[in-house]
Amino acid sequence: MRVPGEASMKIINHALYNDDDTPVPFKRTPNQGRNGQDVEISPSLLVMQYTAGGNLAGAVSWFSNPEAKASAHVVVGRDGEVAQCALFNRRAWHAGGGMWRGRADINSWSIGIEMVNWGKLTKVAGTWRTDTQATYAGHEGDPAVDVLEAPHFNTPGGAILGWPTYTETQLAKVNEVAQAIVAQYGITEIIGHEDFRTDKWDPGPAFPLSSFRSRVLGREEGGGTFDR
């Protein structure tokens, strides 16, 4: 097993490459920069988010739509597939408003990783519903198998919500992507969208942010699965 801190993926000219030197599929998003102009950034923060959707192709298509007014640098699917939508030294539109450690305009100094996941679910008449009120059938066909029931610190009253779990394959690939980014740009801090936006829930309780952060930043030894 790969030692934490050693990235098997790599970054060349701010584009992501696999360990066999093949480039990750790149679909440039029009939703980047500012006022129609590209903006170069020096990233020092990594932001973890979910797509609120069920597949990678849908997320990439959405980020390719100018009407979306949203994007991320890279998307990681449930089967470990990866697509890049913006070079890592370009300002993507993934963070929105909010501040972190007294700094605003987080898009201008961070890299955003989106993971394919439906995100927050609400139970209505015994059925899990997505934020669009669509019935959640479960990634494995049975929502009882892959939904974590837990509160979220941004939800008043501690209401219990549903959170589709991330696959181990997906988590392993996100780990590789994040380690490559950290190695290239010297990033020392990884947070969730939820950490600086009280109206956001991603990546949510199903994502093992604490152990993921430790592993990516080289603060945790050993292998095994990610602790939730």
What spans do the regions from the language model cover?
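N-terminal catalytic cores of peptidoglycan-degrading enzymes
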Residues: 1-107
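Basic/polar, cationic surfaces and motifs that engage anionic cell-wall
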Residues: 2-20, 39-40, 116-228
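Hydrophobic "anchor" residues on beta-strands that sit immediately upstream
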Residues: 45, 110, 189
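Conserved, surface-exposed functional patches that form binding/active-site neighborhoods
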Residues: 105-110, 124-127
